[in-house]
Swiss-Prot record:
Region listing for Disordered, in residue ranges: 1-25
Subunit and interaction comment: Component of the TIM23 complex, at least composed of TIM23, TIM17, TIM50 and TIM21. The complex interacts with the TIM44 component of the PAM complex.
Mitochondrial intermembrane side: 167-174, 216-222
GO CC aspect terms: mitochondrial inner membrane; mitochondrial intermembrane space; mitochondrion; TIM23 mitochondrial import inner membrane translocase complex
Entry keywords, A to Z: Membrane, Mitochondrion, Mitochondrion inner membrane, Protein transport, Translocation, Transmembrane, Transmembrane helix, Transport
Name of this chain's protein: Mitochondrial import inner membrane translocase subunit TIM23
One Pfam match: Tim17
First-listed, main subcellular location of the protein, grouped into a coarse class: mitochondrion
Function: Essential component of the TIM23 complex, a complex that mediates the translocation of transit peptide-containing proteins across the mitochondrial inner membrane.
InterPro entries assigned: Tim23, Tim23-like
Species for this entry: Saccharomyces cerevisiae (strain ATCC 204508 / S288c)
Amino acid sequence: MSWLFGDKTPTDDANAAVGGQDTTKPKELSLKQSLGFEPNINNIISGPGGMHVDTARLHPLAGLDKGVEYLDLEEEQLSSLEGSQGLIPSRGWTDDLCYGTGAVYLLGLGIGGFSGMMQGLQNIPPNSPGKLQLNTVLNHITKRGPFLGNNAGILALSYNIINSTIDALRGKHDTAGSIGAGALTGALFKSSKGLKPMGYSSAMVAAACAVWCSVKKRLLEK
């Protein structure tokens, strides 16, 4: 009945032990050479309780025996332009464009919304129901907030583009370049209103840039 249940016969055991040679080791060696890694899990896990794993015997494509590798990607390097170090680490003009425009837009949106709320509270009709009072305040908030936020975002977007262009042409970033970019941005923003509004806008944006540069310089020196 050994042929039915697959039991080994004495003839099989005798053939396996002919000449006192173990035929399993050559088979494992040839299999390891063909696969390129250790196929026997018993040779990988060793030590008391089988808790130690020899990573050098695992698949070579996994690279587990090389330790920790740190990637140094060029796109992750910070900007090396002279004077370009700011309050937030920046990789170039694209980061300045995104961060600067987004921050100024949110700031303008918040200030405009707060201003609209104050105006709405002052203009609430007397003896009006609660829904009308709430609607009045919300109307002023949605009117002033997006208006100031959009204008501030346009100014910041134009300023960052002009400032980055000036820095690229001069090869450095400094206060003079920022003030010049602010003056050009203000003049461009009111270019359709005439020379006098252009002058006022140019002076105001240039003054704001000068104040920002002085504040940033003080913060970086601390």
